[in-house]
């Protein structure tokens, strides 16, 4: 059970679904679902963490524990963010973890090992909602209208994983 495994890594104790430390499984589940693509305290709240017995004071330590237990994922977020940023800033090509980023004809292409491409229209550097520099691009927002969207390492990783997971039947 992935949620038991996650909780076990985070809290350094064995966790069994209906056995030892089973009370920690729910924390592992919420953390796995909310934090895997860069979420933090806000994502935990959005996933209902406070409704599942977690307290406000437990949320930040839970984020920290998940990230400590998953250093390779956190590093992948950073590496992908650096690659996308370099690609957009320098209008160049760069590769990380077998994933190629290329700027061409006003678009950023992410070439996946499967051969599939992800395309980001009119990418440029801008400020995100926190006031930090990030890659932005034109896309369709929640209101089904074109607008400038911000992105960052974990979001690109989410798109990459989804792109790799698609199956044609």
Residue ranges, per PLM feature:
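Conserved catalytic core of nucleotide polymerization and phosphodiester-bond processing enzymes
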Residues: 1-167
């Amino acid at each position: 059970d992935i949620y038991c495994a996650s909780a076990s890594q985070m809290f350094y104790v064995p966790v069994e679904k209906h056995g030892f430390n089973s009370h920690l499984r729910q924390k592992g589940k919420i953390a796995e679902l909310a934090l895997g693509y860069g979420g933090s305290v806000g994502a935990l709240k959005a996933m209902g963490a406070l409704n599942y017995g977690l307290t406000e004071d437990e949320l930040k330590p839970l984020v920290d524990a998940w990230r400590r237990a998953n250093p390779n994922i956190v590093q992948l977020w950073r590496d992908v963010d650096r690659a996308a940023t370099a690609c957009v800033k320098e209008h160049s090509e760069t590769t990380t973890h077998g994933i190629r980023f290329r700027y061409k004809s006003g678009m950023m292409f992410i070439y996946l090992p499967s051969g599939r491409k992800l395309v980001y229209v009119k990418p440029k550097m801008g400020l995100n909602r926190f006031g930090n520099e990030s890659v932005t691009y034109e896309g369709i927002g929640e209101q089904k209208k074109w607008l400038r969207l911000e992105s960052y390492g974990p979001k690109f990783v989410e798109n990459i994983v989804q792109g790799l997971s698609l199956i044609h039947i």
